Amino acid sequence: MVRILAVIPARYASERLPGKVLLPIAGRPMLQWVYEATIASNVFDQVAIATEDPRVVEAAAAFGAEAILTSADLASGTDRVAEASLHFPDCKVIANVQGDQPFVTPGLLQALVSPYRAGELPEMTTVGGPYDPAQDADDPNTVKVVCDQRGNALYFSRSAIPYPRTVVHDLPVYHHFGLYAFRRDFLAQYRQLPPTPLERCESLEQLRVLEQGYRIRVVPCADKVIEVNTADDLERANAWASQR
């Protein structure tokens, strides 16, 4: 069976919320929540953290995680994942588990790699969760994805897509959570692809894949996840953790 590696990119120099991966949620660094949830899912053969900052390496060691110190000037989290994956050559599928999703569920992680566990070898997979247009349509921090009839992504956007000119039920539109898995050979190929216009416009790295003519399989999952992008998100995460 194919071996699958999970890498958690943990960039300390976050623009919207600096140092957020080490900010406390109910007394533990956010990164520790992500790491422990990923380990507890029993989905992956190996789990590692990738960061540009020695402070994150030190914090990871304190809670028993393996952390890889990567280059500081990488263009994206996926580039950081790719660099870290070079330390694990026996893993043929590489998953990117976001460092700002402290309550990521086993269901989401299982969905992410389910095509590979079923013997398929798509270039890349991601997960689409429940989408509430009334709440999420105008929120640029909620990334939307629309899919074709075969479950492949047509487009990702921070805007509301599709435009509701006509009321249609059961549209293939999801809340995109930013989890990715790659075949190792495609991840290496991805790193060689130059940034693309739509990627730069939306600031969504996955658009590079679509613009270059490759496919991203979107696996639906009913689970939801809290993403921490702002101080308000962090406050909500702390409130949620205190109720667990």
From Swiss-Prot:
Subcellular location: Cytoplasm
CDD domains assigned to the protein according to its UniProt record, in alphabetical order: CMP-KDO-Synthetase (cd02517)
GO MF, one example: 3-deoxy-manno-octulosonate cytidylyltransferase activity
Record has Isomerase as a keyword: no
CC annotations in GO: cytosol
Cysteine disulfide partners in this protein: none
Predominant localisation class: cytoplasm
A Pfam family of this chain: CTP_transf_3
Database matches in SUPFAM superfamilies: Nucleotide-diphospho-sugar transferases
Keyword line: Cytoplasm, Lipopolysaccharide biosynthesis, Nucleotidyltransferase, Transferase
Enzyme Commission no: 2.7.7.38
InterPro entries for the chain: Cytidylyl_trans, KdsB, Nucleotide-diphossugar_trans
Involved pathway(s): Nucleotide-sugar biosynthesis; CMP-3-deoxy-D-manno-octulosonate biosynthesis; CMP-3-deoxy-D-manno-octulosonate from 3-deoxy-D-manno-octulosonate and CTP: step 1/1; Bacterial outer membrane biogenesis; lipopolysaccharide biosynthesis
Substrates-to-products reaction catalysed: 3-deoxy-alpha-D-manno-oct-2-ulosonate + CTP = CMP-3-deoxy-beta-D-manno-octulosonate + diphosphate
Gene Ontology biological process terms in this record: CMP-keto-3-deoxy-D-manno-octulosonic acid biosynthetic process; lipopolysaccharide biosynthetic process
Family note: Belongs to the KdsB family.
Function: Activates KDO (a required 8-carbon sugar) for incorporation into bacterial lipopolysaccharide in Gram-negative bacteria.
Protein name, per record: 3-deoxy-manno-octulosonate cytidylyltransferase
Chain's gene name: kdsB
